[in-house]
């Protein structure tokens, strides 16, 4: 299932008077789900830690974002994608969106996992690496082609790290429960 268009997510986010970008919303949602948080229509209230937050309109871009994200995280073909910025955005905007995504992921993951979850050694490393990325900024990149390639590699690393953490916190326990 494909993610909704980033512009549609931004538009609906503005309609709900949210200060978060599409990248931050997706990062927070992915963190929430990867940390074992429930897939529910009121996901915004959960990741924003605001019980007064209205649930997204059913069938709207934010609801589609939740549904597609759940489907992608559960996909056995590892079809998970990051929702960052519009295609063709300048390198600084893309790097800032990725680092914002990582910060939001960590927040959502922490809210869902609450106490430190049992992670594999690789999961621990992935979480630490995501924390380092969350501290970075676009100032760490130039506009050179090498930086464009480096950003693509970092995006792929983040994608794999998220799948690994989701596997440790959600898929692994679910599989072990089925065995018992």
Curated annotation (Swiss-Prot):
Q: Which InterPro entries match?
A: YgfB-like, YgfB-like_sf
The cellular component terms of Gene Ontology attached to this UniProt record, alphabetical and capped at eight, are: cytosol
One of its Pfam families is UPF0149
Q: Which SUPFAM superfamilies match?
A: YgfB-like
Q: Which family does it belong to?
A: Belongs to the UPF0149 family.
Entry protein name: UPF0149 protein XAC3406
Q: Which organism is it from?
A: Xanthomonas axonopodis pv. citri (strain 306)
